[in-house]
């Protein structure tokens, strides 16, 4: 029996939790050619939601393209990956090469098929002649026009997902935003989802002074209902032949901070531990043994992170954990945790947020990794 809980990869349909309303809205908007902004903190299941939406649209006949912007090292590399993804969607090598050459021949792309020793191969696109800023801007206009040409040529809806979209800021973001917005707004048969896991950056990108202001609907992911998540965990355990003790599902959600990634991780690891012993029931004691194992395995990583923090950042992080992320600036919290001036606290909070240790959710600060939160809580200072 395969482990029924999935983490560390895009979650498949049968292991996907809730999000029916968000999924229905995303599928409907993208199928109608909308340009959707999907904003979500890390570990909320954004990428899995996108995958579910693309799969649903693909079954309806749409051509779907999925790119992760942060995986590219430069603007030109991103444009090369973008062109390759559009040209090769449901296309064989010869057809893709001919289509792309005709579509952007003026930019003189180098198009190759690189076979692998194990069979199959990879279609590669390079733009070696894009050497100046003017060349790159011209190239961007040609590449960003490709989805519209593909939709017209195939007479099918095209849907493009650009995950970790906030990473375009590292590619001279303003220029990219202008070029992409200009192309996208002319493509009625192309749906876009611009998805990002850094809410503050994404909110700025759709602000009044940015090209994507009012470009399309905005979908913000919130946490999954505790009750729905608990029901899911209990069903998945039971269906796999392992009976959860009363309270186990609730404990998993609480220990994991109700973060979808962390919930799936803790449930997955607990299932593995119980299965390895040949048991047919998972108990609260089993869960805490699993948690202790995971903390032990992460000890070196967390200790290295801790050593990188300033003394005040350490104190602030511990205060966030002990206060549940609330009222960190209050006089009581400042005195109890010896945090000093409010301005110093704010500087440490900003530094911890920049390092992806904390995230701000409404008035609260939360530790991004629930295991790190538990590790900090268990340390003696």
Predicted ranges, named:
Residues 1-36, 41, 359:
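A short, basic N-terminal segment
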Residues 2-3, 152, 247, 292, ...:
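C-terminal leucine-rich, beta-strand-based interaction scaffolds used for sensing/assembly
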Residues 41-67:
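P-loop NTPase Walker A phosphate-binding motif
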Residues 58-149:
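Conserved phosphate-binding/catalytic loops and adjacent sensor/switch elements of nucleotide-binding enzymes
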Residues 126-198, 207:
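Conserved Walker B catalytic segment
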Residues 199-216:
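Short regulatory helix/loop adjacent to the ATP-binding pocket of P-loop NTPases
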Residues 217-228:
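Conserved AAA+ ATPase "SRH/arginine-finger" region at the nucleotide-binding site
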Residues 230-300:
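Amphipathic alpha-helical "lid/sensor" segments that cap RecA-like P-loop NTPase cores
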């Amino acid at each position: 029996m395969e482990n029924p809980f999935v983490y560390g990869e895009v979650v498949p349909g049968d292991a996907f939790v809730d999000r029916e309303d968000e999924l229905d809205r995303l599928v409907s908007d993208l199928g109608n050619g909308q340009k959707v902004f999907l904003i979500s903190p890390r570990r909320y299941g954004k990428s899995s939601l996108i995958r579910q939406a693309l799969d649903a649209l693909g079954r309806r006949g749409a051509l779907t393209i999925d790119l992760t912007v942060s995986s590219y090292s430069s603007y030109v590399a991103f444009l090369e990956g973008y062109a390759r993804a559009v040209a090769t969607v449901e296309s064989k090598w010869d057809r893709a090469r001919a289509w792309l050459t005709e579509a952007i021949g003026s930019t003189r792309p180098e198009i190759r098929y690189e076979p692998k020793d194990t069979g199959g191969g990879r279609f590669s696109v390079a733009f070696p002649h894009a050497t100046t800023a003017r060349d790159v801007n011209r190239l961007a206009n040609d590449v960003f026009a490709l989805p519209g040409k593909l939709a017209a040529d195939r007479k099918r809806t095209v849907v493009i997902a650009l995950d970790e979209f906030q990473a375009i800021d590292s590619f001279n973001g303003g220029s990219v935003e202008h070029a992409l917005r200009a192309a996208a707004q002319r493509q009625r048969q192309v749906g876009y989802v611009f998805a990002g896991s850094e809410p503050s950056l994404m909110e700025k990108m759709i602000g009044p002074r940015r090209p994507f202001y009012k470009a399309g609907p905005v979908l913000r992911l919130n946490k999954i209902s505790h009750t729905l998540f608990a029901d899911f965990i209990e069903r998945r355990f039971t269906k796999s032949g392992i009976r959860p003790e009363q309270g186990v599902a609730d404990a998993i959600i609480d220990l994991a901070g109700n973060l979808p990634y962390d919930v799936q991780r803790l449930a997955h690891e607990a299932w593995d531990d119980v299965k390895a012993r040949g048991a047919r029931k998972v108990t609260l004691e089993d869960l805490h043994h699993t948690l202790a194992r995971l903390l032990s395995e992460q000890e070196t990583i967390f200790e290295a992170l801790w050593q990188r923090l300033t003394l005040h950042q350490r104190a602030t992080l511990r205060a966030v954990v002990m206060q549940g992320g609330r009222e960190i600036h209050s006089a009581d919290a400042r005195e109890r945790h010896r945090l000093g001036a409010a301005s110093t606290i704010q500087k440490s909070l900003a530094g911890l947020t920049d390092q992806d240790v904390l995230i701000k959710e409404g008035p609260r600060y939360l530790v991004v990794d629930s295991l790190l939160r538990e590790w900090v809580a268990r340390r003696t200072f």
